[in-house]
Amino acid sequence: MSDMGGLKNLVANTDYLKAQSLDEKEIKKRRCSLGLPHLGNCTDVRVSVSKGFEDICEQQPIGRACFRQFLSVSSPEYLAAAELLDELNCWNLAEAEAKEEARLNIINKFCKADSKSFLAFLTEDEAEKCKAVSEKDFEEVMMGQVKEATQKFLRGQPFEEYQTSLFFDRFVQWKKFEKQPITDKYFYEFRTLGKGGFGEVCGVQVKTTGQMYACKKLDKKRLKKKSGEKMALLEKKILEMVNSLFIVNLAYAFDTKTHLCLVMTLMSGGDLKYHIFHVGEVGIEMERIIHYTAQITSGILHLHSMDIVYRDMKPENVLLDCQGQCRLSDLGLAVELPNGKTTTQKAGTKGYMAPEILKQEPYRTSVDWWALGCSIYEMVAGRVPFRDHKEKVAKEELLRRTLEDEVKFEHRNFDAPSKDIISLFLKRNIEDRLGSNDDPRKHEFFKSINFPRLEAGLIPPPWEPKANVVYAKDTGDIREFSDVKGVKFDANDEKFFKEFSTGVVPIAWQQEMIDSGLFDELSDPNRKESAAGLEDEEQQKSKSCTLL
């Protein structure tokens, strides 16, 4: 008898992997009917769009691109200002010889009075300091006074002129296009990657860009039955707030008749728990552990900078992308605690919860550092500090161990730096715990990590997933849900669904448009305009690519 479950899994994996290799001809076909809305239809957006410089010229990718295009054709002075900021950023991130080369290039290009790119907009005092800059005071002068003067200059007349230019018109058209309604027809859907308490996660692909994402589908009836609406909305709100290389990004939020859908960064390399127990020997190599922990630390610090406590730090919630870089995921238990606020709510996963959570004492961000200590320990030893892998422990005993037992470092792969950082993260006194009052990035464990370069995405990972491997459980191993019966929706439910389904998330969506080439294509003034919108059903790919 043939193994139909194995065949279904093979076909699902094949379609999923095939979709990640873009077919340029197919993409072109899907884009044929796309076009930016005419300016006459963008009046509402022009009135409502933000007029803040940081928002539309720095934070929004398409806004930044349009402003840069304006600067490049307006005047040499405007272009020089933009190029200086770019090159200062490159200098700041460069290392060794490349850093010195970048410094000399900046001096020759921008700091000499006879240079075509000399910064003529500087005041007399600023210009004199710029011309006299040396290796000794380069950072102080160029990254301080000159950089600030350049940013101030761009916020002035160049920004005013930009807002009356054709380039700003183009930005407004994109902001209108950004407001298109999003439904499940915007995507192709692929295999199920996993399931949680309220639904499943599957792979999806945007039809017009080919971009792959993970779609978290929350069952509406299950949410209502388990009173999970507030938690789902909070997770969505937090995902919209964060913008970090080390946290999954939310790109779209929409609903279907049966599900609320969060479309996020696809992390096709699997989670760290999978790598600990199912890839090679139990545990992870120390070089990888250091790299992942550095990225996790940066992600946690990003959350904490916005007064967000993660509360579910564990290897299972740390996902790898196709290049081997990691991000935090599943922010369903995260909580916002502004203005020094604390909570005593019990939340987290057994084996990773800090003493203050278990004792239901007031806490804030300290609990995430405890959980990170447990996670580093597990990456090394294949178990958490106070519970063996798959050991069944009564909650009273686990509480006793967490509050009383000393951490033992018996595994051969523990070294002095890993023992020390774990011990500091697992201090039971919050004030003594690493991360509570100091920066964990300064610990010796991270001596090989250049954090500015890491946070700019410039450090290659020590391990890269294989392109032909699906790092997820077989579809047959993913548990099924029982039916939810007797749940009916009312007006309040419909209001909640509408509040949840806000369509695209601007920064992530704009970056997708740029990365896929669609921004350049639709912004081309020589391109024949057509009605903006999605493909007709007849234009969609005829062959089936949905297999769940």
Swiss-Prot record:
Lipidation (S-geranylgeranyl cysteine): C545
UniProt GO cellular component terms: cytoplasm; membrane
Topology relative to the membrane: Lipid-anchor
Modification Phosphoserine, positions: S33
Chain positions recorded as ATP binding sites: L193, G194, K195, G196, G197, F198, G199, E200, V201, K216
Ranges where the Protein kinase domain occurs: 187-446
Record-listed E.C. numbers: 2.7.11.14
Modified positions (Cysteine methyl ester) in chain numbering: C545
Region: Disordered, residue numbers: 520-548
Protein localization: Membrane
Keyword Manganese: no
Keywords: ATP-binding, Kinase, Lipoprotein, Membrane, Methylation, Nucleotide-binding, Phosphoprotein, Prenylation, Sensory transduction, Serine/threonine-protein kinase, Transferase, Vision
Catalytic activity: L-threonyl-[rhodopsin] + ATP = O-phospho-L-threonyl-[rhodopsin] + ADP + H(+); L-seryl-[rhodopsin] + ATP = O-phospho-L-seryl-[rhodopsin] + ADP + H(+)
Keyword Kinase: yes
Gene3D superfamilies registered for this protein in UniProt: Phosphorylase Kinase, domain 1, Regulator of G-protein Signalling 4, domain 2, Transferase(Phosphotransferase) domain 1
Domain RGS: 53-172
Primary location recorded for the protein, binned into one broad class: membrane
Gene Ontology MF terms: ATP binding; rhodopsin kinase activity
Family, similarity comment: Belongs to the protein kinase superfamily. AGC Ser/Thr protein kinase family. GPRK subfamily.
Its job: Retina-specific kinase involved in the shutoff of the photoresponse and adaptation to changing light conditions via cone opsin phosphorylation, including rhodopsin (RHO).
Protein name in UniProt: Rhodopsin kinase grk7-b
Originating species: Danio rerio
Lineage: Eukaryota, Metazoa, Chordata, Craniata, Vertebrata
Gene that this sequence comes from: grk7b
